[in-house]
């Protein structure tokens, strides 16, 4: 998962 991807960032609960 790419943390720079806004969609993936949505699913990321941890920083």
Swiss-Prot record:
Contains 2 disulfide bonds. N-glycosylated. It comes from Bothrops fonsecai. Its main location: secreted. The keyword Secreted applies. One of its GO terms (biological process) is defense response to bacterium. Catalyzes an oxidative deamination of predominantly hydrophobic and aromatic L-amino acids, thus producing hydrogen peroxide that may contribute to the diverse toxic effects of this enzyme. Exhibits diverse biological activities, such as hemorrhage, hemolysis, edema, apoptosis of vascular endothelial cells or tumor cell lines, antibacterial and antiparasitic activities, as well as regulation of platelet aggregation. Effects of snake L-amino oxidases on platelets are controversial, since they either induce aggregation or inhibit agonist-induced aggregation. The keyword Nuclease does not apply. It catalyses: an L-alpha-amino acid + O2 + H2O = a 2-oxocarboxylate + H2O2 + NH4(+). Its EC number is 1.4.3.2. It is found in: Secreted. It comes from the Eukaryota. Keywords: Antibiotic, Antimicrobial, Apoptosis, Cytolysis, Disulfide bond, FAD, Flavoprotein, Glycoprotein, Hemolysis, Hemostasis impairing toxin, Oxidoreductase, Secreted, Toxin. Belongs to the flavin monoamine oxidase family. FIG1 subfamily. This is L-amino-acid oxidase Bfon20. Homodimer; non-covalently linked. One of its GO terms (cellular component) is extracellular region. Its cofactor is FAD. Expressed by the venom gland. Signal peptide: none annotated. One of its GO terms (molecular function) is toxin activity.
